Design a protein with these regions (language model features):
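Mature extracytoplasmic/periplasmic domains
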Residues: 155, 166-191
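Conserved functional loop/turn residues at catalytic and ligand-binding sites
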Residues: 26, 90, 132
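Short beta-strand and adjacent tight-turn residues that come in two discontinuous sequence segments
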Residues: 76, 95-96, 113, 184
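Well-formed, non-transmembrane alpha-helical positions, independent of function
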Residues: 29, 84-85, 100, 127, ...
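Conserved small/polar residues in nucleotide/adenosyl-binding loops
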Residues: 204-211
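C-terminal lobe and pocket-closing loops
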Residues: 99-166
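Hinge/capping helix and adjacent helix->loop/strand transition within the periplasmic-binding protein
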Residues: 1-81, 141-173
């Protein structure tokens, strides 16, 4: 409430990825390995426990019938470092945003995303839902203004953001990252934020075991 919501712009679905040489071909393989030996599967993320990276993986394990509070989650201080941890073998899976790994597909295999159906910009990437794990989750990006921002300025910026999404330059960036446009200005954005807040609060019980990497 200390800022003024202007508009939401994009959504980035969650993704679970493994190294190209991983024996895991899908999320069912990961779940089977975890249930056989929980210590054999460590999950990397580019932010702390309770963050979007953590929640994506934790929700997937919960839907699979595993206790997400016992899954070892290793938080790195950036997405690039989390990817490096996966590729080095320090972790077996990476929980992140789809946009984060689209540019690394020569090194990783994306084995599940949190979209309700496959996305057109990555048609070969399966959803978790189609594998039997109904996890649907989108991490959004939006713009906010300072307290006291005038209604006129807010509308002007919101319109500009909407116009940007109609340009070929924006479409190229969106497609490269497999983002989805969720342009929702002003009151629509406020309503969206209220819904997202309720959903996020409902996930606070997920506390995967955390191992810190320095």
């Amino acid at each position: 409430k200390d800022v003024v919501p202007i508009a939401g712009v994009i959504g980035d679905y969650g993704a679970i990825a493994v190294a190209k040489n991983s024996p895991y071909k899908n999320f069912k393989d990961v779940v089977a390995a975890y249930k056989a030996n929980p210590k054999s599967v460590k999950m990397a993320g580019g932010s702390v426990r309770g963050s979007m990276d953590h929640l994506i993986g934790a929700l997937a394990f919960q839907e699979a019938g595993a206790d997400p509070n016992k899954v070892v989650y290793i938080p790195y201080d950036a997405g690039g470092k989390a990817l490096a941890g996966l590729l080095s073998g320090e972790t077996q899976i990476l929980s992140t945003g789809l946009g984060e790994v689209m540019g690394a597909r020569d090194q990783v295999r994306i084995i599940g995303i949190t979209a309700p159906k496959r996305v057109s910009d990555a048609p070969d990437v399966p959803t978790l839902k189609e594998q039997g794990f109904d996890v649907q989750f989108v991490n959004w990006r939006g713009f906010f203004g300072p307290p006291g921002m005038s209604s006129g300025d807010k509308k002007k910026i919101a319109k500009m953001l909407g116009d940007v999404q109609k340009t070929p330059e924006w479409e190229a960036v969106r497609k490269r990252n497999a983002w989805v446009n969720i342009y929702n200005p002003d009151k629509k954005f406020v309503k969206f934020l209220q819904t997202q807040t309720k959903e996020t609060v409902s996930y606070t019980h997920l506390r995967a075991h955390e191992t810190t990497v320095y």
